[in-house]
Amino acid sequence: MTTTSKSILLLISDAVVRSAVRDALEHGGYLVTAVGDLGTAVDRLMESPPDLLIIRSYIEDIPGYDAATYLRTRQPGLKVLMIGGLIDDDRLVNRMTLEGFEFFPKPYPAAALIEKVKEVLDKRH
């Protein structure tokens, strides 16, 4: 395992999925703060701004895009990787593209997720 100083705020409401993704990211050498709700995510973001936000396409009953946009108002320039099922709403895909959000569809094998995270972190805004 290679250790990196890059930090990730992981926002996934499902505890089982959150734990699996956190474990994969930590195994990839990332410093991960894993939370299950938007309120806690805001608190953690303000305490220690991460290098990357990874968020599911839905958090509780809130679209992940809306939650990520809200978090980005708290930390402008925050890199965002949304993970989840395929998005079939062209307007949402266009808004995500304009915002610079990245998307990674499930299933997300650990090695592929780690590679995508590295790619997003290496990108310049």
Question: What function would you assign to each model-found segment?
Answer:
Residues A15, G36-T40, A111:
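Acidic phosphotransfer microenvironment of two-component signaling modules
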Residues I55-T69, I87:
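Conserved phosphotransfer microenvironments
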Residues D66, G84-P105, A111, E115:
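Alpha4 helix (beta4-alpha4-beta5 surface) of REC/receiver domains from two-component response regulators
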Residues D43, Y65-G77:
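Short amphipathic alpha-helix used as the core "switch/output" element in two-component signaling
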Residues L113-H125:
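Receiver (REC) domain switch/output surface
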Residues S48-I59, L81:
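Active-site beta3 strand of CheY-like receiver
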Residues A34-L52:
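Acidic, metal-coordinating helix/loop segments flanking the phosphotransfer/catalytic sites
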Residues D14-T33:
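Two-component/phosphorelay signaling modules centered on CheY-like receiver
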